[in-house]
Amino acid sequence: MKINYPLLALAIGAFGIGTTEFSPMGLLPVIARGVDVSIPAAGMLISAYAVGVMVGAPLMTLLLSHRARRSALIFLMAIFTLGNVLSAIAPDYMTLMLSRILTSLNHGAFFGLGSVVAASVVPKHKQASAVATMFMGLTLANIGGVPAATWLGETIGWRMSFLATAGLGVISMVSLFFSLPKGGAGARPEVKKELAVLMRPQVLSALLTTVLGAGAMFTLYTYISPVLQSITHATPVFVTAMLVLIGVGFSIGNYLGGKLADRSVNGTLKGFLLLLMVIMLAIPFLARNKFGAAISMAVWGAATFAVVPPLQMRVMRVASEAPGLSSSVNIGAFNLGNALGAAAGGAVISAGLGYSFVPVMGAIVAGLALLLVFMSARKQPETVCVANS
């Protein structure tokens, strides 16, 4: 099988970003103790990262859109590396939060520009699969990077987890340098024209679907460690094992979502959002024993990431005149859902409803996303392809 080196380089970058984004979720109790805050307060570090992605996605994309894509992507990974180093040496909670925000500024633009690059190096009928290949690095991070970072945090200290992740940033920069063509600087974007594209009702509807889909995921995933500790009475070793299993589910779902979205974006969204809603409603009952927890985490992981490629392609297709900006803003929308999901889960916990209600809240959000897809499906084109420019 011929290796597509640009896609491989993008997947390596996605692996690093996935590790730094998701590893704190398995380390919330450890980080909370380390900076002397509550678990819900530590959860706000995840929300802060998500807010940084929202701000950084359009800002960094517009600032770098006239640069050669290789240079832009390497610069974004340099920000990633610096942010993780600063997180590792942060002396207190507020400094750690600011460091996480800095780290997050690369996220949306990397995946946004990366999605356009991925779609441009394959035939049009394989664009969703190409985007899924890049996101495979994100899912593989949950199999290897996140559990390894969790283990480092539990055994050596959470600071070492961030430092090791910074090392991934260096590897990513090297791989991007040698794998992507140098290219030349592009024309400066027509900001008003591209922003006008984003204001279209069908684009806004697609972005809102992304917010709700991601919100459903992060309502539970942000607090996955204490949820498993509460419902399953899980040990740290079992939590780590479940993170690996969730990562396997992510990878399977990402692959299936990309393949099926090549056939039907809306159909793929409907099917997997329904599955996501059902499995989250079942988790409080299934996860009462370790076998049920393992089954539910694997299915939940698959359903969660199966919606990612179609969500990304949906926005890129309805905003094909501004593929880079729309793709980046969609990543920002994903992380707005991240922030809202973390806040929703934290609100459930703070209200005293118990950790068992956290996945139920996630199911409610998934139901809203599914409803929106049904309402807007007739207006969403299935045949528009992403511009390769």
Curated annotation (Swiss-Prot):
<feature type="topological domain" description="Cytoplasmic">
    <location>
        <begin position="1"/>
        <end position="6"/>
    </location>
</feature>
<dbReference type="InterPro" id="IPR036259">
    <property type="entry name" value="MFS_trans_sf"/>
</dbReference>
<feature type="topological domain" description="Periplasmic">
    <location>
        <begin position="92"/>
        <end position="100"/>
    </location>
</feature>
<comment type="similarity">
    <text>Belongs to the major facilitator superfamily.</text>
</comment>
<feature type="topological domain" description="Periplasmic">
    <location>
        <begin position="352"/>
        <end position="356"/>
    </location>
</feature>
<feature type="topological domain" description="Periplasmic">
    <location>
        <begin position="152"/>
        <end position="159"/>
    </location>
</feature>
<keyword id="KW-1003">Cell membrane</keyword>
<feature type="transmembrane region" description="Helical">
    <location>
        <begin position="71"/>
        <end position="91"/>
    </location>
</feature>
<feature type="transmembrane region" description="Helical">
    <location>
        <begin position="160"/>
        <end position="180"/>
    </location>
</feature>
<feature type="topological domain" description="Periplasmic">
    <location>
        <begin position="225"/>
        <end position="236"/>
    </location>
</feature>
<feature type="topological domain" description="Cytoplasmic">
    <location>
        <begin position="181"/>
        <end position="203"/>
    </location>
</feature>
<feature type="transmembrane region" description="Helical">
    <location>
        <begin position="237"/>
        <end position="257"/>
    </location>
</feature>
<feature type="transmembrane region" description="Helical">
    <location>
        <begin position="267"/>
        <end position="287"/>
    </location>
</feature>
<feature type="topological domain" description="Periplasmic">
    <location>
        <begin position="28"/>
        <end position="43"/>
    </location>
</feature>
<keyword id="KW-0812">Transmembrane</keyword>
<feature type="topological domain" description="Cytoplasmic">
    <location>
        <begin position="378"/>
        <end position="389"/>
    </location>
</feature>
<dbReference type="InterPro" id="IPR020846">
    <property type="entry name" value="MFS_dom"/>
</dbReference>
<feature type="transmembrane region" description="Helical">
    <location>
        <begin position="291"/>
        <end position="311"/>
    </location>
</feature>
<feature type="transmembrane region" description="Helical">
    <location>
        <begin position="7"/>
        <end position="27"/>
    </location>
</feature>
<dbReference type="Pfam" id="PF07690">
    <property type="entry name" value="MFS_1"/>
</dbReference>
<feature type="transmembrane region" description="Helical">
    <location>
        <begin position="101"/>
        <end position="121"/>
    </location>
</feature>
<dbReference type="InterPro" id="IPR050189">
    <property type="entry name" value="MFS_Efflux_Transporters"/>
</dbReference>
<keyword id="KW-0997">Cell inner membrane</keyword>
<feature type="topological domain" description="Cytoplasmic">
    <location>
        <begin position="258"/>
        <end position="266"/>
    </location>
</feature>
<feature type="transmembrane region" description="Helical">
    <location>
        <begin position="357"/>
        <end position="377"/>
    </location>
</feature>
<keyword id="KW-0472">Membrane</keyword>
<keyword id="KW-1133">Transmembrane helix</keyword>
<feature type="topological domain" description="Periplasmic">
    <location>
        <begin position="288"/>
        <end position="290"/>
    </location>
</feature>
<feature type="transmembrane region" description="Helical">
    <location>
        <begin position="131"/>
        <end position="151"/>
    </location>
</feature>
<dbReference type="InterPro" id="IPR011701">
    <property type="entry name" value="MFS"/>
</dbReference>
<feature type="topological domain" description="Cytoplasmic">
    <location>
        <begin position="65"/>
        <end position="70"/>
    </location>
</feature>
<feature type="transmembrane region" description="Helical">
    <location>
        <begin position="204"/>
        <end position="224"/>
    </location>
</feature>
<keyword id="KW-0813">Transport</keyword>
<feature type="topological domain" description="Cytoplasmic">
    <location>
        <begin position="312"/>
        <end position="330"/>
    </location>
</feature>
<feature type="transmembrane region" description="Helical">
    <location>
        <begin position="44"/>
        <end position="64"/>
    </location>
</feature>
<dbReference type="GO" id="GO:0022857">
    <property type="term" value="F:transmembrane transporter activity"/>
</dbReference>
<dbReference type="GO" id="GO:0005886">
    <property type="term" value="C:plasma membrane"/>
</dbReference>
<protein>
    <recommendedName>
        <fullName>Inner membrane transport protein YdhP</fullName>
    </recommendedName>
</protein>
<feature type="transmembrane region" description="Helical">
    <location>
        <begin position="331"/>
        <end position="351"/>
    </location>
</feature>
<feature type="topological domain" description="Cytoplasmic">
    <location>
        <begin position="122"/>
        <end position="130"/>
    </location>
</feature>
